[in-house]
Swiss-Prot record:
<dbReference type="InterPro" id="IPR056176">
    <property type="entry name" value="TPR_COPA_B"/>
</dbReference>
<dbReference type="InterPro" id="IPR036322">
    <property type="entry name" value="WD40_repeat_dom_sf"/>
</dbReference>
<feature type="modified residue" description="Phosphothreonine">
    <location>
        <position position="861"/>
    </location>
</feature>
<feature type="repeat" description="WD 4">
    <location>
        <begin position="140"/>
        <end position="180"/>
    </location>
</feature>
<dbReference type="GO" id="GO:0006888">
    <property type="term" value="P:endoplasmic reticulum to Golgi vesicle-mediated transport"/>
</dbReference>
<keyword id="KW-0963">Cytoplasm</keyword>
<feature type="region of interest" description="Disordered">
    <location>
        <begin position="837"/>
        <end position="870"/>
    </location>
</feature>
<dbReference type="GO" id="GO:0006891">
    <property type="term" value="P:intra-Golgi vesicle-mediated transport"/>
</dbReference>
<feature type="modified residue" description="N6-acetyllysine">
    <location>
        <position position="627"/>
    </location>
</feature>
<feature type="repeat" description="WD 1">
    <location>
        <begin position="13"/>
        <end position="52"/>
    </location>
</feature>
<keyword id="KW-0853">WD repeat</keyword>
<dbReference type="Pfam" id="PF23953">
    <property type="entry name" value="TPR_COPA_B"/>
</dbReference>
<feature type="coiled-coil region">
    <location>
        <begin position="866"/>
        <end position="891"/>
    </location>
</feature>
<keyword id="KW-0175">Coiled coil</keyword>
<keyword id="KW-0677">Repeat</keyword>
<keyword id="KW-0813">Transport</keyword>
<dbReference type="InterPro" id="IPR006692">
    <property type="entry name" value="Beta-prop_COPA/B_2nd"/>
</dbReference>
Length: 906
């Protein structure tokens, strides 16, 4: 099949004319040297200029990264080599290297050497460990030396291109060339080595507009590429992909297949002449330099050609070499999640085509290799050729002996046992095909599913899929698009019925063939099914699985990984990356089986599987059950106390929630349980919970709502003892114990409030409180203290005070007893009464009158409430009250609670 060269522009950096480009091996950086004398470093991920070196005022024709030294080495028209530290931007070294313009710099991959070439027709070797001394000079060219490149397969050998129309191959240590290649009619501008192990090739580009491929062992030209309309300024073999990249002064970059020499693509970004190209092993990025700036494009798919069968045998392609590894060979070695597996790799031989994809058939006996417009089916064990042919795409059926190929954009062929079984033309063409239980064909009109046996249309769906994944049972299918993925259920019984009766069949197929179970807004990169669980890697490098509407994250990946498969007996999921590293993650098959059984509502099977699930995984299962609506089962399964408590609250299981709250000793839990107990009218339990939670406000609410005077009284005493003064004050006040309220205010230093309370409810106490207030205030402001008027001394300022004394005594004598709460509807509310009118005719007893005349304070008086003696009613009420004898408020730790603090601040 033709090379699927998805070409995406990653960076466009406008600048002056670019004379050389380089890519950093580890950072996302592109180095560009400019004609104006500057050198720039661009981050192609963030699209930003990160560093600039002002080298000189003349063109900088060469610049290279030396990553192991954190250097940028530049060569310019001032004949100087400059070395900069790219972290500090400091110039480390500078020296004159040639007597004319410096054209090219090559950095030795292992030794402390750089090679430079110049218009002085010389090539020089420099050793930075020897203070940048010139170790060797290579003479032989008779014109400018435009480019030098070191042989990646032999680091002691390098080649040079010159305007003298020759290519020379040199050896370090020898000042004369090994040999010279001649064939271009004009000056040679560029040269590069083929980095693969299968061909001893060089490529060159020249002013004769031709690109030539040379066999440097036989010293012959094996191919000439024609097509550029102007001088060829750069040419390169890509170190990863089977392509040749050439750039010309005609403004185009041409991409050729390195095996067939077919022109695959032509790029023209409208930035005038192309001057340079750079690529990097391990990356699909290519940097291009133009008159008007530089560009980075990403070529092809980074997904490796790799496949694993159900038994753990992995086959992958490294360039054209096919290799195998077996997970079984690892034995019982300890495997940690996310760590690279130390696999023994076995070479299986080389493939006749460049593999773009490798895929096992369902039973693992055969493996198909696709690429270059062809497919070859091999035996998986020995890599013997079983079948081959031309195809743009290949797809296995669920039946291991069946497969389909897309011969063109209009014809799809189906094969059975390696023999053509059927050929058909889909109604709207075929842009892509997908294997599985049904044959999927994508067209401009959407996705169509066909029956493998008779190619009948099953269903047409208006969707543009990127991937389709079928479950092993054929009941579930995932259709992944560019933005989301859909989970569908395939209703095979309805399809069979419709095929027999022809009911519900339209031009778009059988209407009831699929049922949509869910749509998830996440991008699927790779995926597979285990039971009814769909496992996938996402665009944000997460390893997730989807089951029953729930997404569970297994791991966060630190780089792009591709799913290979799942081996149930190992309980492990295996993934690979583009460098062909294999890692794995634990994923218990028992958990997946349990979730699958629950999804199918097969609870008997789920109960059988449950004992095999380790305790540490039970909570994950419980969360799944909860999301499916099976909260009672989730409560039984979960081992997490927090989760169990939440479930118990939701289910109203008071006993379980109580036990968990006792174990947790958490105030928050006691409060939550108290709310539930109140909603269930379990007031005794609510009272105990509020007590454990030290929730005085809640206890007060409960006591007042139930009309429990006993509880209010004990709460008042306990709250005061523990410093919860707001609650204590309210509890006393509700009982009519205004004297206790007054004493509480005095003890807590709230003397102004105490004075107003006394004036309102206990006029006989006003004088005492005012004196205390005055004494306290005098410590701060003597003048303000003296301005306070004692009502007994200034009766003219407090009209009605004497009458208030009488009414206070009347209230004390006539309102001494409490009414039961059930009498509330019969009592006239205080706001509707005029106590001064009711008590104005009261004649105080002699003792009380004498006390007032003597200026002695009378005993405290309760707040006004309706008086009634109701022993029977009180007795019946007490029978309904909750006994609080066991409520020991003294034991409550209240050090971290201060209910009246906010009010005190107001």
């Amino acid at each position: 099949m033709p090379l699927r060269l998805d070409i995406k522009r990653k960076l466009t950096a406008r600048s002056d004319r670019v004379k050389s480009v380089d890519l950093h091996p580890t950072e996302p950086w592109m180095l560009a040297s400019l004609y104006n004398g500057s050198v720039c470093v661009w981050n192609h991920e963030t699209q930003t200029l990160v560093k600039t070196f002002e080298v000189c005022d003349l063109p900088v024709r060469a610049a290279k990264f030396v990553a192991r030294k954190n250097w940028v080495v530049t060569g310019a028209d001032d004949m100087q080599i400059r070395v900069f530290n790219y972290n500090t931007l400091e110039r480390v070294h500078m020296f004159e290297a040639h007597s004319d313009y410096i054209r090219c710099i090559a950095v030795h991959p292992t030794q402390p050497f750089i090679l430079t070439s110049s218009d002085d027709m010389l090539i020089k070797l420099w050793d930075w460990d020897k203070k940048w001394s010139c170790s060797q000079v290579f003479e032989g060219h008779t014109h400018y030396v435009m480019q030098i490149v070191i042989n990646p397969k032999d680091n002691n050998q390098f080649a040079s291109a010159s305007l003298d129309r020759t290519i020379k191959v040199w050896q370090l240590g020898s000042s004369s060339p090994n040999f010279t290649l001649e064939g271009h009619e004009k000056g040679v501008n560029c040269i590069d080595y083929y980095s693969g192990g299968d061909k001893p090739y060089l490529i060159s580009g020249a002013d004769d507009r031709l690109v030539k491929i040379w066999d440097y062992q036989n010293k012959t030209c094996v191919q000439t590429l024609e097509g550029h309309a102007q001088n060829v300024s750069c040419a390169s073999f890509h170190p990863e992909l089977p392509i040749i990249i050439t750039g010309s002064e005609d403004g185009t970059v041409r991409i050729w297949h390195s095996s067939t020499y077919r022109l695959e693509s032509t790029l023209n970004y409208g930035m005038e002449r192309v001057w340079c190209v750079a690529s990097l092993r391990g990356s699909n990025n290519v940097a291009l330099g133009y008159d008007e700036g530089s560009i980075i494009v990403k070529l092809g798919r980074e997904e490796p050609a790799m496949s694993m069968d159900a038994n753990g045998k992995i086959i992958w392609a490294k360039h054209s070499e096919v290799q195998q590894a077996n997970l079984k060979a690892m034995g019982d070695a300890e495997i940690k999640d996310g760590e690279r597996l130390p696999l023994a790799v076995k070479d299986m031989g080389s493939c006749e085509i460049y593999p773009q994809t490798i895929q096992h058939n369902p039973n693992g006996r055969f493996v198909v290799v696709c690429g270059d417009g062809e497919y070859i089916i091999y035996t998986a064990m020995a890599l013997r050729n079983k079948s081959f042919g031309s195809a743009q795409e290949f797809a296995w059926a669920h039946d291991s002996s069946e497969y389909a190929i897309r011969e063109s954009n209009s014809i799809v062929k189906i094969f059975k046992n390696f023999k053509e079984k059927k050929s058909f033309k889909p109604d709207f063409g075929a842009e892509s095909i997908y294997g599985g239980f049904l044959l999927g064909v994508r067209s401009v009109n959407g996705l169509a599913f066909y029956d493998w046996d008779n190619t009948e249309l099953i269903r047409r769906i208006e969707i543009q899929p990127k991937h389709i994944f079928w479950s092993d049972s054929g009941e579930l299918v995932c259709i992944a698009t560019e933005e989301s993925f859909f989970i569908l259920k395939y209703l095979s019984e309805k399809v069979l019925a419709a095929q027999e009766t022809h009911e519900g069949v339209t031009e778009d197929g059988i209407e009831d063939a699929f049922e949509v179970l869910g749509e998830i807004q996440e991008i699927v990169k790779t995926g597979l099914w285990v039971g009814d669980c769909f496992i996938y890697t996402s665009s944000v490098n997460r390893l997730n699985y989807y089951v029953g509407g729930e997404i569970v994250t297994i791991a966060h990946l630190d780089r792009t990984m591709y799913l290979l498969g799942y081996i149930p007996k190992d309980n492990r999921l295996y993934l690979g990356d583009k460098e062909l590293n294999i890692i794995s993650y634990s994923l218990l098959v028992s958990v997946l089986e349990y979730q699958t059984a629950v999804m199918r509502r097969d609870f008997s099977m789920a109960d059988k599987v449950l004992p095999t699930i380790p305790k540490e995984q039970r909570t994950r299962v419980a969360h799944f059950l909860e999301k499916q609506g099976f909260k009672q089962q989730a409560l039984t399964v979960s081992t997490d106390p927090e989760h169990r408590f939440e479930l118990a609250l939701q289910l109203g299981e008071l006993k379980i929630a109580y036990q968990l709250a006792v174990e947790a000793e958490s105030e928050q839990k006691w409060k939550q349980l108290a709310e539930l107990a109140i909603s269930k009218c379990q007031f005794g339990l609510a009272q105990e919970c509020l007590h454990h939670a030290q929730d005085y406000g809640g206890l007060l609410l409960l006591a007042t709502a139930s009309g429990n005077a006993n509880m209010v009284n004990k709460l008042a005493e306990g709250a005061e003892r523990d410093g919860k003064n707001n609650v204590a004050f309210m509890s006393y006040f509700l009982q009519g114990k205004v004297d206790a309220c007054l004493e509480l205010l005095i003890r807590t230093g709230r003397l102004p409030e105490a004075a107003f309370l006394a004036r309102t409810y206990l006029p006989s106490q006003v004088s005492r409180v005012v004196k205390l207030w005055r004494e306290n205030l005098s410590k701060v402001n003597q003048k303000a203290a003296e301005s306070l008027a004692d009502p007994t001394e200034y009766e003219n300022l407090f009209p009605g005070l004497k009458e208030a004394f009488v009414v206070e005594e009347w209230v004390k004598e006539t309102h001494a007893d409490l009414w039961p709460a059930k009498q509330y509807p019969l009592v006239t509310p205080n706001e509707e009464r005029n106590v001064m009118e009711e008590g104005k005719d009261f004649q105080p007893s002699r003792s009380t009158a004498q006390q007032e005349l003597d200026g002695k304070p009378a005993s405290p008086t309760p707040v006004i409430v309706a008086s009634h003696t109701a022993n029977k009613e009180e007795k019946s009420l007490l029978e309904l009250e909750v006994d609080l004898d066991n409520l020991e408020l003294e034991d409550i730790d209240t050090t971290d609670i201060n209910l009246d603090e906010d009010i005190l601040d107001d």
